[in-house]
Amino acid sequence: MRQLFVLDPLSQIRPEKDSTAALMQAAQRAGDDIWSCTPSDLIARGDEPMAVALPVTPDPWIAVGAPERQSLAGFDVIWMRKDPPVDEAYLYATHLLEVAERAGVRVLNRPSALRAWNEKLGALRFSRWMAPTLVAGRVSELMAFAREQGDVVLKPLGGRAGLGVIRVQAEAPGLKALLELVTEQERLPVMAQRFLPDVTEGDKRILLVDGDPLGAVNRRPSEGEFRSNLAVGGQAEATELSEPERQICAALAPALRAEGLFFVGIDVIGGMLSEINVTSPTGVREVERLMQEPLADQTIERLRSLV
């Protein structure tokens, strides 16, 4: 197969930690031709999708050939693996990738789903599995929810890697001013969730491939921190899935398959769903290292069975 990876500039990739690098190397081991480009390299001339792409040999990291204009219709699979934020440039890239999709190319994850499934709001489809949650921009609503729950976590809807996530108590002085700040004076909604004390034991990143859980790691927060994201100092640990976690995965699977969300990372705290990550989920390297599971190879094998 010919596979194109749309991602951040290769110079920014840390291959020893990066899930996209792991997938590219697994595709190479499967005998596929690997190409890469950034979102700004995508082109549509009329209804013909193209890209100025680089032929790459990702293992060992990395040999890069000269850029070539390629018809996207000539690829079997295109991976959209650009990291958030989901800004204008990101959204326009998904529209250009839809042109390739109409030409018969399998795009992962499906561009329309990348737009529709905000990584915070998408979880609301499965609210029965979540802690009490409120999404609002009105400060009075958020304050009432904080008083009701006592201890809450506030998340920006466009955030990633734990950035901008804060924990507040209802009686905290200056709560109203803080809520005015995070909502930009009630211009933007934020997500408020009941704080789950189980987070001190870690939150679990579960990677689902075509709806099936193929790997997971526990991410334990560092001393004095409640955020467990690896990007803010969390430590990855080996883990196994509990029965409630398997039930969550089973509940999500039909919707993920129907929406074309082939590679997804969900976050679970104390048996409760926190987020559904669809843009460029991480954790492959940690699963492979801690669980001794060839997750990237399994992902490419599953993909080849579907294309």
Curated annotation (Swiss-Prot):
This chain's source organism reads Parasynechococcus marenigrum (strain WH8102)
Q: Which PROSITE patterns match?
A: ATP_GRASP
Where on this chain does ATP bind? 146-202
- Could you name the Gene Ontology cellular component terms for this entry? cytoplasm
User: Which named protein is this?
Assistant: Glutathione synthetase
Name the catalysed reactions: gamma-L-glutamyl-L-cysteine + glycine + ATP = glutathione + ADP + phosphate + H(+)
Which pathway does this polypeptide act in? Sulfur metabolism; glutathione biosynthesis; glutathione from L-cysteine and L-glutamate: step 2/2
Molecular function terms from GO: ATP binding; glutathione synthase activity; metal ion binding
Q: Which HAMAP family match?
A: GSH_S
Q: What is its EC number?
A: 6.3.2.3
| Key words, A-Z | ATP-binding, Glutathione biosynthesis, Ligase, Magnesium, Manganese, Metal-binding, Nucleotide-binding
- Reported cofactor(s): Mg(2+); Mn(2+)
In terms of domain of life, where is this protein from? Bacteria
Residues in ATP-grasp domain copies:
120-304
